[in-house]
Amino acid sequence: MALTASAPVPARAQSAPECPPAPLIRLHLPHLQAALTAGKEAVIVALGSSSTRGEKASDPAHSYPAVLQTRLAQALPGWHVAVLNRGINGQDAPEELARLSADVIAVRPQLVIWQVGANGAMRKSDPERFRQRVTEGVRELQAAGIDVVLMDNQHCPRVDATPEGVLLDQVLGQVAKQVGAGLFSRAALMETWQR
């Protein structure tokens, strides 16, 4: 205890630097908007791998789906929006496509945020096969009346070390345009932070 009492105390605590504000992303989400306008519970499914699951988050309450749930509750008082976490560590397009019907469509969401490509990059997935799988999945979701936002890769050493990381991000952008899905580019956001 004497050691603690005699330790020097900084005159003023330093606050952590803040990230610059994220650029505004305009998304067309007619099914989600219709549910909210009608006063119905809106359901968002976060589909993906460990980034979605929250593998490296300090606790489950800090996974991005949990934070999204909290922020939506604060931003939309009076409306109920449920965000369901369907992230499974190590998965990518083949595994996520295989469980689309049971894990996603079955809960009848208005919106799916599909984080895909990081594990594919580390596995050196063929970009054309990746394109086919993601396109098939997005079309299946849209046919079920679900809005889709694709989420690309975050910058991290294991993904950045592969040429597939950039290629699969490019494919996601192309698929989003081709099929009319939204795109949330974590890569572009992180590049903005670096400037």
What are these regions (language model features)?
Residues A16-N89, R99-R108:
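Serine-esterase "nucleophile elbow" of acetyl-processing enzymes
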